[in-house]
Amino acid sequence: MKSEFNNILIENPELNNNSIVEPNPLNENSLNASLTKNLSLKEPTRTKKIILSFFTAFIFFSLLFFLYINKLPNINLLNNKYISLASTDKKSKNYIELKFNCKDPTIPVQLFNSSNDIKNHIKTLNVGGKDENITENFTFGFAGKYKVIIQFKDKLTSLKNLFSGCAQLSIANFEYFDSDEIVDMSGLFEGCLRLKYVEFGDFNTKKVITMENMFNGCINLNQLNLSNFDTSNVQYMNGMFSQCEELFSLDLSNFNTKNVIRMDSMFRGSDYLFILNMSSFDTSNVQDMSKMFDTCSNLPSLNISHFKTSRVTNMESIFHNCRKVMTFNLSQWDTSLVTSFSSMFSGCTKLSNVSIEHFDTSNVMYMDNMFLRCLNLTYLNIKNFKTSKVVTMENMFNGCEMLTSLDLSSFDTSNVVNMAGMFCSAFSLRSLNISNFRTKKVERMDYIFNHNLMLTSLDISNFDTINVDIKRNFFNGINPKGKIYINFDKVSNGILKQLPRGWEFIEK
């Protein structure tokens, strides 16, 4: 008892020797009983509250899960394992393996966009290890990574648009697929935004006729091995690698393109592409090359001197925005059937030299934007251009900041209706020969000589602009002094009002 008392002293420093009172046994027992009672009341109450909270939360989330899961298709997406389809003959099972990276479970998995009713050829669709007879698009219930196997009950002849718009597909494996009868691969992966890799194995493409838009819009595709492709019967490659924005290197040296008739937009928008091997290309039957390399802005050079272009009719925007290419060797190109050079070299900001003096332009109708913003182009020999069929030359040399002279005396402009901005912002242009221009049909000439800062002499004596109404921006920003040779009888009032002050007018 004494030790207990000493403890009380330690715990209660306010007590001293003069106020020490011997503890009452009765009071001590009462105190112990009270403490025991309080503890016995508090502990169960706290435990009960915790248990009740957990139980309530469990009921709540279970209810939410039940309501959500009832909205999903009746397929098993929770078991995330590959099924085993091992076989000594890889193609005997005739299936395609897929991997999906599902970030938004509300987006449907587009597997059946084909117009040739591919879903009727599907034997089973295995999702997460369980075979499901699914004949319509479905959604993954939860975000995550999934493995899917599509097994076919017979040989297909077409894969057209099979995965088109399948934005959550990341990897496709055709190693076990029987491709012997395939003739159509157009749009196969078009719009597969998350596709990064495709394993084709020994995919048989011998009978394939079209690969149009095959990888178009695969903006995350970063590697492709097509070394086993037999393209000897392919006729359509237009848009094949368009918008492959992460593709750095592409080796097509094995491609046989002797039967290809369309290559338009083939590499368009593949702005990360740095290495492109087309050494085996035979383009002797190609008719359309428009936008073929459009916005391949990372390509440092293009080895296309061997291209045969005698059947090509359209070269619109073929090199548009090839910003790093400094020179093009087109000396062997036959352009006799081409009708459009529109935007052909526009945006080639580093282009300094291009040999096109031999071009046959006798059938060309469109030359608008042809050299637009060729900022480093210093020389251009186009004296031999035949332009009698051309209807538009709008912005043809606009932004050619380093070009110092242009001899267009041989140009026949009798059918041109639009010359707007034709020489605009050619800041360094000192010599411009347009003395033989015929402009009777021209309807637009606005901005034609804007910002020709170095130009001191201009012969527009043959200009007939009576039908052209230009209220402003004909000579805006031109050199403050110079000479203009003009025929006042053929010049509209709108142009007369804009003749630059400080210039000497010489009537012819």
For the regions a protein language model found, what residue spans apply to each?
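Small/polar residue-rich beta-strand/coil "junction" motifs that cap repeat-based extracellular fibers
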Residues: I448, R472-G477, K483
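Structural signature of tandem-repeat unit edges
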Residues: Y146-K155, Q168-E181, L193-I209, I219-Q235, ...
